[in-house]
Amino acid sequence: MTKRYWNINLEEMMEAGVHFGHQARKWNPRMAPYIFTERRGIHIINLTRTARFLSEACDLVFDAAGKGKQFPIVGTKYQAADSVASAAIKARCHYVNKKWLGGMLTNWSTTGTRPRKFKDLKKEQDTGQSNRLPKKEAAMLKRQLAQLQKYLGGIKYMTSLPDIVIIADQQEESTAIGECITLGIPTICLVDTDCDPDLTDIPIPANDDARASIRLILNKLTSSICEGHYSSMKGESMKS
């Protein structure tokens, strides 16, 4: 894996509040190597460690994006949901930002059919076929579409299990992490001071409650993915 410079600035991270952890009494001792100090009962995250792991994660996704790998971004709590969607759309990634449905990955043989169903129903609606349905059936179709869009809209183009999953909050997305562990899918995850860094392949020590912190970390990762896509396209055009 080639190391690159990703312009990860400690001052920028401080302004975003990346360094603020949880109350010291709520900590996970496994986060000790990533904690700088305790201030007024709050753990302060060591941002030099954050920068190191974030840079490592950026290198990984850059290389993987250049090989056409898939990266769903997962973050369903309200502080993360909007940032997850905007970052994923920017980098042409899949995303889940409303609710992680149990078995979304471990039961992919079923989950994978739902986006296809969504596209079929959407086509019916767009072509006006639903207008010929009885009123009750048309209303049912509309409800189905709304539900599928809400929970699966971000993965409607995902045709196979992902290669790497980016997770905005370990505690909130424990089911997703468990499924990735079961299937051996690598994860990149923001870990606050109450998390277990051993549950993820690349833990990024960071405040997982502040919108600015989540947005900054996700933007660095998705910028690296975009650069990986661009580098790959540039390489292909030079060959032809």
Curated annotation (Swiss-Prot):
The record ties this protein, via InterPro entries, to:
Ribosomal_uS2 (IPR001865), Ribosomal_uS2_bac/mit/plastid (IPR005706), Ribosomal_uS2_CS (IPR018130), Ribosomal_uS2_flav_dom_sf (IPR023591)
Q: Where in the cell is it found?
A: Plastid, Chloroplast
Provide the disulphide bond pattern: none
Biological processes, Gene Ontology terms: translation
One GO CC term, this protein: chloroplast
GO MF entries: structural constituent of ribosome
Fetch the Gene3D superfamilies from UniProt: Glucose-6-phosphate isomerase like protein, domain 1, Helix hairpin bin
Keyword annotations from UniProtKB, A to Z? Chloroplast, Plastid, Ribonucleoprotein, Ribosomal protein
Which coarse location class describes where this protein primarily resides? plastid
Pfam families listed in its UniProt record: Ribosomal_S2
> What is stated as this protein's family in its record?
Belongs to the universal ribosomal protein uS2 family.
**Protein name, per record:** Small ribosomal subunit protein uS2c
Name the species this protein comes from: Cycas taitungensis
Q: Which gene encodes it?
A: rps2
